[in-house]
Amino acid sequence: MNMKEQIHTLSEEMIANLGRLVAIDSQLGTPEEGKPFGAGPAKALEEGLKIAEELGFKTVNLDHYCGYAEMGEGEEIVGIAGHLDIVPVGGDWTYDPFKLTREGDHVYGRGTTDDKGPVLEALYAMKLLRDSGVKLNKRVRLIMGCNEETGSKCMEHYNEVAEELSCGFTPDANFPCIHGEKGHMSMTAYSKNTQIISMNGGFVSNAVCDTCTTVIPTETGLKEKLEASLAETKLQQYRVTEENGQITIFAKGVPAHASMPELGVNAAGVTFECMEKAGFEDDFVKFYNEHIGMSCDGAGVGLKFEDEYGALTLCNGIVKTEDGIISCTIDIRVPVTLKAADVRTMCEARLEDENGRIEIGEIGDPLFFPRESPLVNALYKAYVDVTGDTEHEPMVIGGGTYAKSLKNIIAFGPEKMGMDYHIHSADEFILVSEMEEAVLIYMEAIKNLLAI
């Protein structure tokens, strides 16, 4: 039986174990003693380590921040870092997000692709490599994190208490290979004076705001003008109702990850735009449309920039109203040739006027490995050797992964280019056939990394 056939025979077992992980709601929760990210992530980590133990690996739980499964001997460590925490469910799911549902090659559930499925792909790659009798001149360590989606504090803890990795990868992006990740910058826009009674939408800051409900005072003819304006947009659904002197606007856009906001439709942005087109005079509506708007390039805040590896992107993820003030979270992905200080300087003059203000939050520098570095070459070779695909080259992405938190690793798979796995959206899925192929690719990758 060749290796591909061996992987196929283990496929049902791997999917069953994925079901065990998907069944756990591992969103960030309220910290408890010994559970820094809440009960859900801690339970997912315990289950992930239990699966690894059942497969014969030594495991270590690092205070429920993260843990790892390990094989081999030696001082050097080939590391693989995935995460078991998930983003909020949100959206209109066809399937139960916490019950693995299989339809043909598709397996649905929150975390199937981001990132519980890839963690198991790496784990089974380790198992098959170990069982094949390959000499392990280094340790191979699969780290399971619990806080990737909300700050990667799990990897901060790993760096404090565990050994540095010699090289490795994180299975939390795309094939064929990621040799750079854009920097990250967060902003929040606030209203000063507004007639908007309430405006709320979005679930997470790192995804396009795909639903929004807005309440404004009624004006003669405004409802009809809003409906006419909304009818010309790319919204999936909209609804305008008028009652008791108020107009309520519901808008449903299209979700997308903040690293590729151009693939989505911002429900809040459409609402702001349509309010202005309909003649609703409001200071913050003007501010939003001028500084944020429907463009994803950051031009409104003076940040339009593009290098050979990609353009700066801007995404409005959440809109909410508290104490009469509207706030809009903004997620910006910064090209790899820009530094955080450069970005701050570029936008300083565009952060406030009489209609609103924008505060700069967290800023993180980009990550970049030269295309011909040994690490990039080793991983890319594994991908090409298994798939035969030489058309797609290593790339730079807008997403951020554990590669920015751990030394000497880059993101590597398992998503295929051009595929939409509904990550951070409803009906997230993974393909069983792609899981099997990823196991084979990760086996080859580990072997290549053992040799450098």
Predicted regions and their residues:
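Active-site metal-coordination/substrate-binding segment of hydrolases
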Residues: 54, 77-144, 150, 161-163, ...
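Midchain, well-structured core segments that form catalytic/ion-binding scaffolds
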Residues: 149, 155-335
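Acidic/His- and Gly-rich active-site-bordering loop/insert found
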Residues: 2-110, 134-136, 251
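Acidic-glycine-rich active-site phosphate/pyrophosphate-binding loop
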Residues: 87-102, 184-185, 189-191, 241-253, ...
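Buried hydrophobic packing segments
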Residues: 48, 119-129, 158, 271-275, ...
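An extended, acidic, His-containing surface patch that forms the Zn2+-binding/catalytic region
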Residues: 252-323, 329, 333-345, 357-452
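A common structural junction motif
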Residues: 85, 230-237, 278, 349-355, ...
